[in-house]
Amino acid sequence: MDRDHTSVEQEHSERFVDMASRTNRLGILQNPDGYGKRIGDCGDTIELYLSVRGDRIQMVSFQIQGCLNTNACANTLAYLVEGRSVADSWQVTPENVFDYLETLPPDHRHCAELVVGAFYHALNDYSATRQESWQKAYTKR
């Protein structure tokens, strides 16, 4: 195990380490039901994709250009919303992500805000696409 990974494990909660190291949600979801993108002041960028079935969020995937903290926040958001109704998912806040991770550094709280902001954009996109179903035929990016 390299020194950087050992340092992360020593400085962070088990939840943080788990969420920061996951890669199973990385990637572009083909024909997403919702898409959101945010670029943070720090330069981190997240593109977030939603798959919704029966008004429940079935899957969240994302692409990130950013730090380990942003990856941890994105995986946490996905964990918190997958399986929930779209309406209920609007209740997820950056504070929920911050609290779940337990050891997200306070000076990286903006990572949770960035991820949740992209998620809200994806929810808005999903709602707009449902109203204008012809839009789903076009690539979102």
Give a label for each model feature.
Residues 30, 46, 69-70, 86:
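Short, flexible micro-motifs
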Residues 56-61, 71:
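Short small-residue beta-strand/loop micro-motif enriched in glycine and branched aliphatics
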Residues 64-73, 111:
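Short, thiol/selenol-centered motifs that function as redox-active sites or metal-ligating centers
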Residues 29, 39-43:
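A short catalytic or substrate-binding loop motif that flags glycine-/basic-rich loops and adjacent residues
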